[in-house]
Amino acid sequence: MTIDTTNESDNSPTNSPGLEASARTFSLNASKMVRITDDYADEVFIEQNDVVIEKPRMDPLHVRKLMETWRKAARRARTNYIDPWDEFNIHEYPVQRAKRYRYSAIRKQWTEDIVDVRLHPDSFARGAMRECYRLKKCSKHGTSQDWSSNYVAKRYICQVDRRVLFDDVRLQMDAKLWAEEYNRYNPPKKIDIVQMCVIEMIDVKGSPLYHLEHFIEGKYIKYNSNSGFVSNAARLTPQAFSHFTFERSGHQMMVVDIQGVGDLYTDPQIHTVVGTDYGDGNLGTRGMALFFHSHRCNDICETMDLSNFELSPPEIEATEVAMEVAAKQKKSCIVPPTVFEARRNRISSECVHVEHGISMDQLRKRKTLNQSSTDLSAKSHNEDCVCPECIPVVEQLCEPCSEDEEDEEEDYPRSEKSGNSQKSRRSRMSISTRSSGDESASRPRKCGFVDLNSLRQRHDSFRSSVGTYSMNSSRQTRDTEKDEFWKVLRKQSVPANILSLQLQQMAANLENDEDVPQVTGHQFSVLGQIHIDLSRYHELGRFVEVDSEHKEMLEGSENDARVPIKYDKQSAIFHLDIARKCGILEAVLTSAHIVLGLPHELLKEVTVDDLFPNGFGEQENGIRADKGQKPCDLEEFGSDLMEIAAEMGDKGAMLYMAHAYETGQHLGPNRRTDYKKSIDWYQRVVGFQEEEELDSDCGKTTFSSFAPLTRHEILAKMAEMYKEGGYGLNQDFERAYGLFNEAAEAAMEAMNGKLANKYYEKAEMCGE
């Protein structure tokens, strides 16, 4: 960057008195100082064969001149700043008191204080749900007051519950954490999400609530939405950021609805697996499916080694235009020389199951580093130490330790380019120079023109003055919390590709190491649920491009609701097959019904010919041969799928397998009648029925279309098999007698006395 220093006052370092003496003093202390800019930090250390070698330090006179030049540029920018809201005379409106509520995403705590504001009574913008007002807030720094910061106060048009506003703040601050983590990977462009809080106008009747954000100057653009919309603007960063959050969270959440000015975003939305938090905009896996259908991995995704989400050939071909736009953007995107670590070398840990809570809730359950872990000892670490233990503490010590620091950060206005601030500076670290993937193993750069001896004295005096490290004491504590937060979170990264998941699982089995991630069923299930949602969206015509003739036909006829929608069956079957491989019960059962020619709810018009257009045989039997299994026909393949669904807990599939083993039908050439297995499946169904009687809410979800059998009917079938014997089951009249009596009692409870008498008669015959 070139800064014009002409027409400045003659106070440059070259004309200052006593320059030579100052230069000598500066040279003596230069060895104890570290660099403040990344432009020259790269010249301090080089790495050869994993050995860090110190290069000659740069000229201190040049550094001093550079620092003075930057100070002049900052003063000039401050002096020439023109408030865009001067014409509205907000300073003429009365000062009002407001209670401000701020949320800490790390500590999951709310803090409140009283602030002075001036609110313009007329709204200047209006959306679908909220309207915006101009506001200025008084920022107090010491004894001075500053009203120069511009804010936007957003109020809901319709009356909403008070909790909705606080949920919106929690959502945006959680998304802001993900933006900070994204910046740590040194993408081509850093991003930031606007700080937001809630203010309550306590001096106004009714104490209305507003969302408060900094005013962003520039052109407001919506890059993507929570329903799969992607802007035509050739921007790679917003889409890569959404993809990044999905993989980094272990498939548990995704930040979408990216909008704002440049790379300063506001009003995002978060999709989670459970789909019940973060408001009505959280579409769960359905929203994730809509995003991946319109998303194509770009250069940033590839550089960060994010996995390509599986799409069918027709889906890929349908987005050639989007790929061309991305190619044009590639030419204009200047990527810094950053080397990212490959996924195969990154270590991630097992992702928590969805029943234990979403990613952010799990990660907050951690311990803050104690005082001894962050203490710098002059005896063991000198000023030039670049060990992993020293670097984070040095960076934290370089930050101010003001109690009002959070307020100061929020009070300074931001512009489109303000994303590269303190968080961005802390993120300038090489995270890709180690094969282990742990950030602590990488070598960040020290930053700041700071004498470390004085730093330690300042740090020790501050620590002694506050006694202990409280949660609100200093920036160091907050940064330590963030480091611990992301240290745990990075271990949950999971690829968004079933093939990558399978390879990761194979690697874990081969390594047999605790540090190698074990792929859980939950990770497969989330990915599979996204694919099953895509298959359902295809069937509903969500991605159908309706031509004018078809549109007129749909709008002009009353019976068109019964006309089947012509959708992309190939893509729907493609996603159904991947969902089946991921172990989604609905996908497994739907595939089984299609193969066996049974009615099914999902993809009703798909037949076995659509599922296997080239015929069933060689490919499927080749896979079975690789697993050491015998070749099968189509009927046995369907029976295998049905048995898998039964093992997964579907009662209809259990009844099907029990009946199949009882009669020997629809089992294929490699299976025969087996009374023992039939009774085993019948017993499982009875067990499920007993659980449902104890608790009606704990019944297993079934996707089968089989007519359920009553308890007394199942018991009677089991009794008949024990009475007859054979097919792997020993004849047992005593057991048959007991089962017939149980069936009779169950029939009496079902108010079927005639059938109960029949069962009692059969029981007496077994007793004779």
UniProtKB/Swiss-Prot annotation:
EC number: 2.7.11.20
GO annotation, biological process: myosin II filament disassembly
Gene: efk-1
Bias kind Polar residues: ranges: 1-17
Pfam families, per the entry: Alpha_kinase
Top-level taxon of the source organism: Eukaryota
SUPFAM superfamilies: HCP-like (SSF81901), Protein kinase-like (PK-like) (SSF56112)
Record SMART domains: Alpha_kinase
Gene source species: Caenorhabditis elegans
PROSITE patterns associated with the record: ALPHA_KINASE
UniProt feature, compositional bias: Acidic residues: 402-411
Activity regulation statement: Calcium(2+)/calmodulin dependent activity. Undergoes calcium/calmodulin-dependent intramolecular autophosphorylation, and this results in it becoming partially calcium/calmodulin-independent.
Cleaved signal peptide residues: none
Family indicated by similarity: Belongs to the protein kinase superfamily. Alpha-type protein kinase family.
Catalytic activity: [translation elongation factor 2] + ATP = [translation elongation factor 2]-phosphate + ADP + H(+)
Residues holding ATP: 279-284
Residues covered by region (Disordered): 1-21, 402-446
Family annotation (CDD domains): Alpha_kinase_eEF2K
Function text: Phosphorylates elongation factor-2 (eEF-2) at two threonine residues that are conserved in all eukaryotes and are located within a GTP-binding domain. Calcium(2+)/calmodulin dependent activity. Inactivates eEF-2 by catalyzing its phosphorylation. eEF-2 catalyzes the movement of the ribosome along mRNA during translation in eukaryotic cells.
Entry GO MF terms: ATP binding; calcium ion binding; calmodulin binding; elongation factor-2 kinase activity
Quaternary assembly: Monomer or homodimer. Interacts with cmd-1 in the presence of Ca(2+).
Record's keyword terms, sorted: ATP-binding, Calcium, Calmodulin-binding, Kinase, Nucleotide-binding, Phosphoprotein, Serine/threonine-protein kinase, Transferase
Domain annotation Alpha-type protein kinase: ranges: 102-309
Entry protein name: Eukaryotic elongation factor 2 kinase
